[in-house]
């Protein structure tokens, strides 16, 4: 894409309404625009990042055996009355009526609807286990939406729901999603720490929040530093091997980790001072087993091998892609702007033409631009008639991983400058060497 032809509405000043760095940078980088309180339009740069995050989430969900569906945003109130949640959910749920005066709602979550889909088609234990997921916009009427897309009223959410014959089967599905989440966050360039979460009235131990460390995080967290040394399974992991999955979950839950709400001072005191880590963190995912909470009132049953009907045991697994965009920025930025991990950067390269009216500079830029596109990359060419300083500031602000700087002096020596956005390290290469180096990545 040529920046002269792209829609990138940058802001020079920090917006006064933005309280945290991710909100400021997303507005300044032209990623989002607030339409009303807690509701945002996603502009081209932000949409590209959001799509890349969703792509990684899909890949890891399907690697773990989840199957994608798409459920509507508008739901019937009757389903929620079946589960007894319609009146209990509170003012966060947006309730509406159609022209026939039927009660509807803008879905804040999808347990009832996915349970209805399941009970409509699945009859036998032979069809289990089953894990259905979707990525859809949701709405919760927050009292005080703030922090941009970190806590908005409308947000994009990936929900997966597992269905098993019994609790033992649910544990296997839970472990599968636990490992899938570790891999998902790793692919996004994040180090996520699973922390025991409150299971509420259902009880049990199958509930974890995944927290990333960030200085501006909303939660205080306490964990053993050994977490920082653990290795996330690579793509060769066999999700059908129950023993391997159980061992990975055991490894990642054997050290102390808790948010402030679940913190246990007695357990914390057992950890040596050298291994204690107190920090701030951001929740980026939550997995939860809720048993028959929905299958019982909604009659989601299957015929077991024993010839009897069994209520299915369910689990829920959530990741918010729109929230993740902000979380990544909170964890990866500097005073000049965003620093995107390569896996979700909106463009792979930023090519800076320091002097567009110089024939040699323009020729070198065109050669790089076309060569990188031919190699399968998505470069952004800044071909605007702007000052070099303005172009450098733009590239730093939007955070592309690699900058290729093309100026008259370097081109005269048949070279261009490569700058790593994260480290700031620069090196000079010929145009041919640049194309040779990156065409094999």
Swiss-Prot record:
PROSITE patterns for this protein: AA_TRNA_LIGASE_II (PS50862)
Record keyword Aminoacyl-tRNA synthetase present: yes
Gene3D superfamilies linked: Anticodon-binding domain (3.40.50.800), Bira Bifunctional Protein, Domain 2 (3.30.930.10)
Enzyme class: ligase
Alphabetized Pfam families for the sequence: HGTP_anticodon, tRNA-synt_2b
SUPFAM superfamilies: Class II aaRS ABD-related (SSF52954), Class II aaRS and biotin synthetases (SSF55681)
The enzyme's E.C. designation: 6.1.1.15
InterPro entries: aa-tRNA-synt_IIb, aa-tRNA-synth_II, aa-tRNA-synth_II/BPL/LPL, Anticodon-bd, Anticodon-bd_dom_sf, Pro-tRNA-ligase_IIa, Pro-tRNA-synth_IIa_bac-type, Pro-tRNA_synthetase
HAMAP family (UniProt xref): Pro_tRNA_synth_type2
PANTHER family: MITOCHONDRIAL RIBOSOME PROTEIN L39/PROLYL-TRNA LIGASE FAMILY MEMBER, PROLINE--TRNA LIGASE
Assembly information from the UniProt record: Homodimer.
Protein name: Proline--tRNA ligase
Organism: Bartonella henselae (strain ATCC 49882 / DSM 28221 / CCUG 30454 / Houston 1)
Gene coding for it: proS
């Amino acid at each position: 894409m040529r920046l002269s032809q792209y829609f990138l509405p940058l802001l020079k000043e920090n917006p006064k309404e933005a309280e945290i760095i991710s909100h400021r940078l997303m507005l300044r980088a032209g990623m989002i625009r607030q339409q009303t309180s807690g509701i945002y339009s996603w502009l081209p740069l932000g949409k590209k990042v959001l799509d890349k995050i969703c792509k990684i989430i899909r890949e890891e969900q399907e690697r773990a055996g989840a199957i994608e569906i798409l459920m509507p945003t508008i739901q019937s109130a009757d389903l929620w009355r079946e589960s007894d949640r319609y009146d209990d959910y509170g003012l966060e749920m947006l309730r509406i009526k159609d022209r026939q005066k039927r009660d509807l709602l803008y879905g804040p979550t999808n347990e009832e609807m996915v349970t209805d889909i399941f009970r409509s088609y699945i009859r036998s234990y032979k069809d289990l286990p089953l894990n259905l997921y979707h990525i859809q916009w949701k709405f919760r009427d927050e009292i005080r939406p703030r922090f941009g897309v970190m806590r908005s009223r409308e947000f994009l959410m990936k929900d997966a729901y597992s269905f098993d014959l019994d609790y033992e089967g649910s544990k296997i599905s839970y472990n599968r999603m636990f490992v899938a989440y570790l891999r998902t966050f790793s692919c996004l360039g994040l180090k996520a720490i699973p922390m025991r979460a409150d299971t509420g009235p259902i009880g049990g131990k199958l509930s974890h929040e995944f927290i990333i460390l960030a200085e501006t995080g909303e939660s205080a967290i306490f964990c053993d530093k050994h977490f920082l040394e653990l290795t996330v399974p690579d793509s060769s992991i066999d999700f059908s091997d129950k023993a391997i999955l159980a061992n990975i979950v055991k490894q990642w839950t054997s050290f102390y980790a808790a948010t402030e709400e679940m913190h246990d001072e007695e357990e914390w005191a057992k950890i040596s001072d050298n291994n204690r880590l107190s920090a701030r963190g951001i929740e980026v995912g939550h997995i939860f087993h809720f048993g028959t909470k929905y299958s019982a009132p909604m009659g989601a049953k299957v015929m077991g091998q024993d010839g009897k009907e069994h209520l299915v045991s369910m689990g829920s697994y959530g990741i918010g892609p729109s929230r993740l965009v902000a979380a990544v920025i909170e964890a990866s930025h500097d005073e000049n702007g965003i620093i995107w991990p390569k896996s979700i950067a909106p463009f792979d390269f930023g090519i800076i033409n320091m002097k567009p009216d110089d024939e040699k500079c323009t020729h070198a830029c065109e050669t790089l631009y076309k060569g990188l596109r031919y190699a399968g990359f998505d470069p952004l060419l800044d071909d605007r008639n702007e000052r070099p300083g303005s172009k450098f500031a733009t590239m730093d602000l939007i955070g592309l991983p690699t900058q290729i700087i093309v100026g008259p002096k370097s081109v005269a020596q048949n070279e261009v400058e490569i700058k790593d956005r994260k480290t700031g390290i620069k090196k000079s290469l010929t145009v041919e060497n640049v194309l040779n180096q990156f065409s094999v990545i």
